[in-house]
């Protein structure tokens, strides 16, 4: 309105609708927004009017109009920029943002519709299949019943799979427990065997066989010292009766040092012959052959306790029961004629 009045005053009162429209269009096209110093006609009005109040009112009205145009944009789409490319970029950016938002909504809606359509098509296929199958038997089912049965079957299958998995887990736990028990049992067995081996090693061989070892050693020494042929049964029984009552074999609680049965023969038994038995028997005429008495038998090299061939020439008489053969004596001439071997005595002592 003020623009029209100023134009009419400058032009001398000519008033046309076309001139007012041109002025409004130019102001709206070139100077939209907060461009306060770019209006040449405003400077012309302030210079020629020379009125302070009119200039203040004109500036105030212009500020109000610019503020209102800034808040409420015009419909023609002009943003006050003369750069066509910049305006095109801005418009394209806004249009692309809007298109992006719209496309996301469209895709979301399309997915929902597609899901519904697929479910409906599947339902129609199931209904058609069931109806075609049951048409032969004179039956007709709906898709809901078939789906219900399918869901029941799926539930039963899932329940069976769950039970099988639980059984497998329980079986694995049981096998693990059994394996643990087996390991514990094997460890206990190994400890028991080690303990048995330890106590078995602590028992001396003489404690395991208290009579055989000493009888054999005594028989060998008797054979070497007397020169008699080695007769194991006769010598063993004779020595057993001559030794008389012996203490019981030591148990595991006794130590090896305190063992009364030793594998060594005392030195006094090597020097002196065995004493005669208390009970004389009828076999007192058992004598050594003359050829064996003249030459003492040397000890064998391999110590295999074999009878010399010269002693095999004269057969020995049959032996009586063990109780009768207790008077086995060594002739004194054989004892006197035996050479003294200190090395053998040292070995026997060791």
From Swiss-Prot:
One of its GO terms (cellular component) is nuclear pore. PANTHER family: NUCLEAR PORE COMPLEX INTERACTING PROTEIN, NUCLEAR PORE COMPLEX-INTERACTING PROTEIN FAMILY MEMBER A1-RELATED. This is Nuclear pore complex-interacting protein family member A1. Coiled coil: none annotated. GO terms for biological process: mRNA transport; protein transport. Belongs to the NPIP family. May associate with the nuclear pore complex. InterPro entries: NPIP, NPIP_N. Keywords: Membrane, mRNA transport, Nuclear pore complex, Nucleus, Protein transport, Translocation, Transport. Widely expressed. It holds the Pfam family NPIP. Residues 306-325 are annotated as: Disordered. It comes from the Eukaryota. It is found in: Nucleus, Nuclear pore complex; Nucleus membrane.
């Amino acid at each position: 309105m003020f623009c029209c009045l100023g134009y009419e005053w400058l032009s001398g009162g000519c008033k046309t609708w076309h001139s007012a429209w041109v002025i409004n269009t130019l102001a709206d096209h070139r100077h939209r927004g907060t461009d306060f110093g770019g209006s040449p006609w405003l400077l012309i009005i302030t210079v020629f009017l020379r009125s302070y109040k009119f200039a203040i009112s004109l500036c105030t009205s212009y500020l109000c109009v610019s503020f209102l145009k800034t808040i409420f944009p015009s419909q023609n789409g002009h943003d006050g920029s003369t750069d066509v490319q910049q305006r095109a970029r801005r418009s394209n950016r806004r249009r692309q943002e809007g298109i992006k938002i719209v496309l996301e909504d469209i895709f979301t809606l399309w997915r929902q519709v597609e899901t519904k359509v697929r479910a409906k098509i599947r339902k129609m296929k199931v209904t058609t299949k069931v109806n075609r199958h049951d048409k032969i038997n004179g039956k007709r089912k709906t898709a809901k019943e078939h789906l219900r049965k399918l869901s029941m079957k799926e539930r039963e299958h899932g329940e069976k799979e769950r039970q099988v998995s639980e059984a497998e887990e329980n079986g694995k736990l049981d096998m693990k427990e059994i394996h643990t028990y087996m390991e514990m049992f094997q460890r206990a067995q190994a400890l028991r065997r080690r303990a048995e081996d330890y106590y078995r090693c602590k028992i001396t061989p003489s404690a395991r066989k208290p009579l055989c070892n000493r009888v054999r050693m005594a028989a060998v020494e008797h054979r070497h010292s007397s020169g008699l042929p080695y007769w194991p049964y006769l010598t063993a029984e004779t020595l057993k009766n001559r030794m008389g009552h012996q203490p019981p074999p030591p148990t595991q609680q006794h130590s090896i040092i305190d063992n009364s049965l030793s594998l060594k023969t005392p030195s006094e038994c090597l020097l002196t012959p065995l004493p005669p038995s208390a009970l004389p028997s009828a076999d007192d005429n058992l004598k050594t052959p003359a050829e064996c008495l003249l030459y003492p038998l040397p000890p064998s090299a391999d110590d295999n306790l074999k009878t010399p061939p010269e002693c095999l020439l004269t057969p020995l008489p049959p032996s009586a029961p063990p109780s009768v053969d207790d008077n086995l004596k060594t002739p004194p001439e054989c004892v006197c004629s035996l050479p003294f071997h200190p090395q053998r005595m040292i070995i026997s002592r060791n």
